Regions:
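Non-transmembrane, aqueous-exposed alpha-helical and coiled segments at domain scale
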Residues: 2-162
Length: 162
């Protein structure tokens, strides 16, 4: 089921993203698909979507053409990042082109066609997300703020041979 205005806070946040021009229709549509897959809108989900889309641009790859090693571990809420990556990058557990490793950090390494990019969320961003109750009225508002930031505000990254 696609989120709509009837879906409460998530629907309202998605409508606000569209109205605010949160980075273009690819981002908006991918976030909508990620919410459908994951079950709700949250900031780590959006951060994962942003990582996957960034990796696709950096590696000039279509969904499913990359491999990803994600270092979140399997403990929510940080692991919600995985669902965003699966939807945006097409790296899925079913395809076997994604793996999850400790140590519980917001970092993913993507590789394709002999190239690699490692993307890590800024510590300040992760801290802000983890303390969202102190800063935002809702989880959806926190996700909306993440969707509007530039890659440079969210991530550090390193390119290299794959």
């Amino acid at each position: 089921m696609r989120p709509s205005t009837a879906d409460g806070a998530a629907g309202a946040a998605l409508l606000e993203m569209r109205g605010a021009g949160a980075g273009g229709s690819i981002l908006e549509e991918t976030i909508e698909r990620a919410v459908e897959f994951h079950g709700h809108l949250g900031p780590f989900l959006v951060l994962g979507v942003r990582m996957g889309l960034f990796a696709r641009r950096e590696l000039d790859s279509a969904p499913g053409e990359m491999e990803a090693v994600v270092k979140t571990g399997a403990v929510p809420s940080l692991s919600c990042l995985l669902d965003g990556i699966q939807v945006s990058a097409g790296c899925t557990l079913g395809r076997g082109n994604i793996s999850v490793e400790p140590p519980g950090i917001a970092e993913a390494e993507f590789s394709a066609s002999g190239r690699r990019v490692t993307i890590r969320a800024m510590d300040e961003v992760v801290g802000e997300i983890k303390s969202w109750r102190e800063r935002y009225a809702s989880l959806e508002e926190a996700a909306l703020k993440i969707s509007k930031r530039s890659d440079e505000e969210l991530f550090s990254w390193e390119r290299g041979p794959g």
